[in-house]
């Protein structure tokens, strides 16, 4: 069992129940899933670029990513419908808690010129999205084997009803939000 999951049940749940005065433990917000997405526009010219991105995302998440394809053709970007343009992975359960632990304790502190996470990146329904400019902040990615520094999007989906509840949930996990 992940340490962060135990921490959630033992510390975060009672803290949030008291703060928001919930009647039941089931009302307390929880993290449902974490989605990692890597858009690789250069994959149109060179197919190996997408293979390298898939390998990086697999190392970061510990799970095989799915390749995403263009939904419709866009002449301005020289993209046709069905072209592979990225990859994504959805983490749930044990892998989600392990990734969240590594994100908070290892990856976020390794971000260059880091001044805190943007507290306005909530979507209005309690989900938080953040972008990472370099995949090399994760220790699983071998720096010598990286062909190009790419970023990725991280979306944390919660079942919180409001942004305030979700912010309190993530702050309880020691997410370093900007003041």
Swiss-Prot record:
One of its GO terms (cellular component) is ribosome. Keywords: Ribonucleoprotein, Ribosomal protein, RNA-binding, rRNA-binding, tRNA-binding. Pfam families: Ribosomal_L5, Ribosomal_L5_C. InterPro entries: Ribosomal_uL5 (IPR002132), Ribosomal_uL5_bac-type (IPR020930), Ribosomal_uL5_C (IPR031309), Ribosomal_uL5_CS (IPR020929), Ribosomal_uL5_dom_sf (IPR022803), Ribosomal_uL5_N (IPR031310). It comes from the Bacteria. GO terms for biological process: translation. GO terms for molecular function: rRNA binding; structural constituent of ribosome; tRNA binding. Belongs to the universal ribosomal protein uL5 family. Part of the 50S ribosomal subunit; part of the 5S rRNA/L5/L18/L25 subcomplex. Contacts the 5S rRNA and the P site tRNA. Forms a bridge to the 30S subunit in the 70S ribosome. This is one of the proteins that bind and probably mediate the attachment of the 5S RNA into the large ribosomal subunit, where it forms part of the central protuberance. In the 70S ribosome it contacts protein S13 of the 30S subunit (bridge B1b), connecting the 2 subunits; this bridge is implicated in subunit movement. Contacts the P site tRNA; the 5S rRNA and some of its associated proteins might help stabilize positioning of ribosome-bound tRNAs. This is Large ribosomal subunit protein uL5. It comes from Idiomarina loihiensis (strain ATCC BAA-735 / DSM 15497 / L2-TR).
């Amino acid at each position: 069992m992940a340490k962060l999951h135990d921490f959630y049940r033992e510390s975060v749940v009672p803290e949030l129940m008291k703060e928001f005065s919930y009647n039941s433990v089931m009302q307390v917000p929880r993290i449902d899933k974490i989605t990692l997405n890597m858009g690789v526009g250069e994959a149109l010219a060179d197919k190996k670029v997408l293979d390298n991105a898939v390998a990086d995302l697999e190392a970061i998440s510990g799970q095989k990513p799915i390749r995403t394809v263009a939904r419709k053709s866009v002449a301005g970007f020289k993209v046709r419908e069905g072209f592979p343009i990225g990859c994504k992975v959805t983490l749930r359960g044990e892998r989600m808690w392990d990734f969240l632990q590594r994100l908070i304790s290892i990856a976020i502190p390794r971000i260059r010129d880091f001044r805190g996470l943007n507290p306005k990146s909530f979507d209005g329904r309690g989900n938080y999205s953040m972008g990472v400019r370099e995949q090399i902040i994760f220790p699983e990615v071998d720096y010598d084997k990286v062909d190009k520094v790419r970023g990725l999007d991280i979306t944390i989906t919660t079942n919180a009803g409001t942004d305030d509840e979700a912010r309190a949930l993530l702050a309880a996990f020691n997410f370093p939000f900007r003041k």
